[in-house]
From Swiss-Prot:
Full protein name: Immediate early response gene 5-like protein
Similarity comment: Belongs to the IER family.
PANTHER family: IMMEDIATE EARLY RESPONSE GENE
One Pfam family hit: IER
Matching InterPro entries: IER
Species this protein is from: Xenopus laevis (African clawed frog)
Amino acid sequence: MEGALDAQSLISLSLRKIHNSRTQRGGIKLHKNLLVSYVLRNARQLYLSERYAELYRRQPFPQTMDECDEPDIPELSPLQIPEEGEDEMHQLPRIHSGGAELLEPLSSEETLELPPCAHSPHPAKEPQSHAAFYSPVPSRGFCSSGESAGPPQCSHTTVLDLDTHVVTTVESGYLHQDCPCQGAPLLSKRKYAPAGYGSYSGHGGPGEDLGDTAEPSFVPCKRGRYEDFCPQPLGEPADSNNNNISNLISIFGSGFSGLMSRQTEAEQTLNGHLCGKHALGSLGAWTRAIVAF
C-alpha cells in the first residue's frame, strides 16, 4: 500500500512539472519533459499493479475439491472372459480334409457362363509372313525407284545451323546418303558461311545460278554498340550532381528550403546572429531541441 501511495505522489508531481514547463521554451526544458514523462509512465504502471493486486486478494476463491471422484472402471465378470474353445470358434474356418474337393478343377458342365457378347464371332486376322512384315514401306520423302512411271523428283533445301554457322544441303527432306535414287552414297555438302556481309549459297560459287529451288541465304546482323544509341554528353556529371542536390533539398522539406532562403536574404541585410534566430524561429519544436543539444 505504501508503494501505491508513493506512485500516486510521483504521478501528481510529474503532471505538475509537465504543465509548468509547457509555458517555457527551449531544448533543455523539452529534454526534462521527456524524462518526467518516463517517470510518470513507470509510476503509473506501479500504481496499477498494486491496485490490481489488492483487488485480486479481496476476490473470494471457490472451495477446492478435496478428493477427485475417480470414474468407475468396469470389472469383467468371469462369465464374460472368453474361453479357449470359443476363441477358436470366432477365428476363420480352416480347410479340412474336405477342402481338397474345392481345389479340383470344375467339369465342363460346371463352367461359368460367358456373357452373350463373348459368343459373337470375331473376324479372323490373316497371319502375316515374316517377309511381308519386314517389307519396306514406301515413304513420301524418298525418291521414286527406277521402275516407277515418272522420273525421280528431288527438291533441294539449304539449312543453316545458327550455332555452328554450317550450311547443309538437303534433298527431299533427307541427306544425299538417305536418298535411294543415288547410285553411291554421297556426303552432304557443307560449307562455312563467311564472317562478313553478303549472300552465300550452299552449292557453288557466288556466280552460279541455283534457280527457284534454293532458299534465300541467312544474312547475319551486326550488333551495335551501346554508345552509338545512347551517347553520353560531356556535361552529364555536373548535371547529375545538381540533380542530387535538388533531390536532397526536396527530401528535407519546406523547413530546409525556408532556412536556405532566409539565409540568403539575411546575408545581404542582417548579420549572422540575427540570421540564426530567424532560421530557428521558422523550425519546429523538435528541430529546436536538436539544435540546442
